[in-house]
Regions:
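Short-chain dehydrogenase/reductase
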Residues: 93, 181-182, 241-244
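C-terminal substrate-binding subdomain of Rossmann-fold SDR/epimerase-dehydratase oxidoreductases
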Residues: 201, 205-326
Length: 326
């Protein structure tokens, strides 16, 4: 397969690209390699350098809404487009709503136009569990979506755009929609919840928990990447939507306490929940298990320990945090 991957330099993206390359697929990456100002430049440079180690695919550092995308489609001739590129999460979109809409809507529209123009067969859209809004455990893909906040709204709008474009091709272009949740792991940015918890614990600082009883379906990045690749190469996923998560909810308080336990330092402070974020639980993954054998292997305890060990062996973080004695 010739697979064009947008956002292929990101946390999930680079893990997906490595798996696709190892399976013998031809991959081309489009990624602006920006962090939208959420982490220091030296950290971004470090992350990009480490993520790209071993990747052979060509990287095009352009915006997906650029007219230059037409030339990439003409030259590479993808039969599959995987759209991972996005603003990273709700907080960033809320702070930059117009820029968020441009990236998440205009960029997607350009990709869909290019895909229909150039005869792409399959479009993989990486959405988010944020489309559901408030939900409890065992939410299925056919649940009514009531997103709260611009990130979830734009992701759900993207799902409908993808469905509409594929509907109008009368079967020549199919789609697969993926809804991941709370993905974490090595080479993530420091501004996500598990990264914040782990770094605060390693520094011996206070882990600030916004809503002790709030739960998330934390998913280790290897499991998320395996699920996305499985859905991409399967013949049974056309025009379907899948939850790709660990399918187990953890409270934020339990996650913070686990980080403190593993690091051997730090303390926990509970605060009021953030009203801008929906209350979430675990997602049901029966459809992914049935259609392409998705089987997430890394539970939160093992995942946190793997993530912690990565910090301890990362030259960048050892130097930045003075972790030589840890």
């Amino acid at each position: 397969m010739n697979i064009l991957v947008t956002g292929g330099c990101g946390l999930i993206g680079h893990n997906v690209v490595k798996r696709l390359e190892s399976a013998g697929h031809n991959v081309s990456i489009v990624d602006t390699m920006t962090d939208y100002g959420i982490i220091p430049k030296d950290e971004l440079d470090h992350l990009i350098h480490e993520r790209m180690k071993g990747i052979k695919s060509t990287i095009h550092p352009i915006c997906i809404s650029s007219p230059l995308m037409n030339g990439i489609f003409e030259k590479f001739k993808p039969d599959t487009v995987m759209h991972l590129a996005s603003f990273p999460r709700q907080k960033v979109v809320n702070a930059n709503p117009q820029a968020g809409a441009k990236v998440m809507s205009e960029g997607l529209l350009n990709l869909l136009e290019m895909s229909t123009k150039h005869g792409v067969k399959k479009f993989i859209y990486i959405s988010s569990s944020m489309v559901y809004g408030d939900f409890t455990d065992d939410v299925r893909e056919d649940a009514v979506c009531k997103p709260q906040g611009q990130y979830g709204i734009l992701k759900l709008a993207g799902e409908w755009l993808v469905k509409d474009y594929t509907r109008r091709t009368n079967g020549s272009l199919t789609h697969t929609i993926i809804r991941p949740s709370a993905v974490y792991g090595p080479l993530d940015v420091e501004d996500r919840v598990i990264s914040k918890f782990m770094l605060a614990a390693l520094r011996g600082n206070t882990l600030k928990v916004n809503g002790a009883g709030e739960t998330l379906d934390f998913t280790y990045v290897d499991d998320a990447a395996d699920g996305i690749v499985g859905a991409t190469i399967s013949d049974l996923t056309a025009n379907k939507t899948y939850n790709i998560t660990k399918s187990h909810s953890w409270t934020l308080l339990d996650a913070a306490n686990l980080a403190v336990k593993i690091a051997g330092s730090g303390s926990v402070e509970c605060r009021d929940r953030d009203p801008d974020f929906p209350s979430r639980g675990a997602l049901n993954i029966d459809a992914a298990r049935k259609d392409f054998g998705f089987n997430p292997l890394i539970d939160v305890d093992d995942g946190f320990r793997k993530y912690h060990n990565w910090f301890l062996t990362s030259t960048y973080w050892k130097n930045k945090l003075n972790l030589s004695d840890k």
